Swiss-Prot record:
UniProt-listed InterPro entries: Syd (IPR009948), Syd_sf (IPR038228)
UniProt name for this protein: Protein Syd
Pfam families to which the protein is assigned, alphabetical: Syd
Species annotation: Colwellia psychrerythraea (strain 34H / ATCC BAA-681) (Vibrio psychroerythus)
Topological category with respect to the lipid bilayer: Peripheral membrane protein
Gene3D superfamilies named among the record's database cross-references: Syd protein (3.40.1580.20)
Gene that encodes the chain: syd
Keywords, ordered alphabetically: Cell inner membrane, Cell membrane, Membrane
Localisation per UniProt entry: Cell inner membrane
Amino acid sequence: MTSTNKTLTQAILNFSKSYSQQHVEQFGHLPTVEHDEQWPSPCDLGSHDTSHHYWQAVAMESVQLADNKEEALSFENVESALNIELHPDIKIYFTTIFSGDIEAQSDDGELSLLFAWNKDDFERLQENIIGHILMKQKLKQVETVFFAVTDEEDMIISVDNSSGEVWVEQVGCKPHKKLSDSLAEFISQLTHKNVVSEKS
């Protein structure tokens, strides 16, 4: 099943916004990340202390509008390299926001939603997706694209490239548990992990 573009985009924007809001309510400030001058991001909102900066997810569209020279990020190169068409939900998911990992809770356990931190990270992500799909093809398994990691070692959450369904799979193995009919439905069912203490 395919999520409508607007529904999936809004689900991602809403969940990332509420993640930041929950962090502010719990800790009195936005999420923080260890600062790396060599790894700038439009998500970076300045110093929290000597080693950490505040961050917040940013819509990629707003970054592109702010810089007329910035081209919209796409997966055309990935599709060309693999000679396949990626499911629309996969492309929407990874081109909606720049963000750090967003921790979440599902009925099946804890997970971290993966996003690109900056343009270079987006390119690294594309390379990882190409590697993942090539592995799937070599193993003659259904082609999937991962978008989240779980608290269980080697267990990832992915989208079936043909159906758009969300599944759990062990790295190198066939998907073994269906979680949702679509990515938008899956994200809409997530809740925010109740963080006991702030990560440094």
